C-alpha cells in the first residue's frame, strides 16, 4: 500500500501496461519489492538513474503480484481468494468472451445459470465491476 512507501522511491521498471485507455509504468519498489503502477501523464515526475537491476531475478515476483490482481488496482488486504460468482445465463453468456482475469473459469449450473470462478485479490476494480454487474 502507498501509505507504507516513503517518497521519493526507486522503482525497478518491468513493463508498460495499457489498461482502460491509460498507459502505466509497472515495476517493483526497489526496497520492499512491492508492485507499483503509475499512470503516465503530464503529472508524473520521475528521474532516470544510472543504477541497474537484475530483471530476471525479480521477474517471478513481479508476475506473481500482477497475476493476483483483478485489473491493476491494489488489493484491499493483500490476500488472494477463490471467488465464485453466480450469473444468470443471458448475462453470463454475454460476459464469457471478455478477459476478466487469467484464472477465469465458467461452470454451467443445473439451473441454467453460470458460476464464474476466479483466483485473485479483491480490489477497487472488482468491487466496481460487481456493482455495475448487479
Map each language-model feature to its residues.
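Extended Gly/Ser/Thr-rich low-complexity repeat segments
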Residues: 124-134
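Short, mixed charged/polar active-site loops
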Residues: 5-8, 33-35
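A short catalytic or substrate-binding loop motif that flags glycine-/basic-rich loops and adjacent residues
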Residues: 7-8, 17-20, 77
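Short, surface-exposed charged micro-motifs
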Residues: 13-15, 105
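Generic structural signal for coil-to-beta-strand starts
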Residues: 22-24
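Surface-exposed, charged, gly/pro-rich loop-and-adjacent secondary-structure segments at domain edges
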Residues: 26-125
Amino acid at each position: 500500500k502507498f501509505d507504507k512507501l516513503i517518497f521519493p522511491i526507486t522503482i525497478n521498471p518491468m513493463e508498460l501496461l495499457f489498461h482502460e485507455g491509460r498507459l502505466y509504468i509497472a515495476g517493483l519498489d526497489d526496497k520492499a519489492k512491492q508492485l507499483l503502477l503509475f499512470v503516465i501523464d503530464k503529472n508524473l515526475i520521475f528521474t532516470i538513474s544510472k543504477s541497474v537491476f537484475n530483471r530476471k531475478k525479480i521477474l517471478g515476483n513481479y508476475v506473481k503480484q500482477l497475476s493476483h490482481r483483478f485489473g491493476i488496482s491494489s488489493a484491499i488486504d493483500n490476500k488472494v481468494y477463490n471467488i465464485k460468482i453466480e450469473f444468470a445465463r443471458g448475462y453470463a453468456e454475454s460476459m464469457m468472451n471478455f478477459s476478466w482475469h487469467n484464472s477465469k473459469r465458467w461452470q454451467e449450473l443445473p439451473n441454467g445459470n453460470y458460476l464464474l470462478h476466479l483466483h485473485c485479490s479483491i480490489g477497487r476494480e472488482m468491487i466496481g465491476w460487481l456493482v455495475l454487474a448487479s
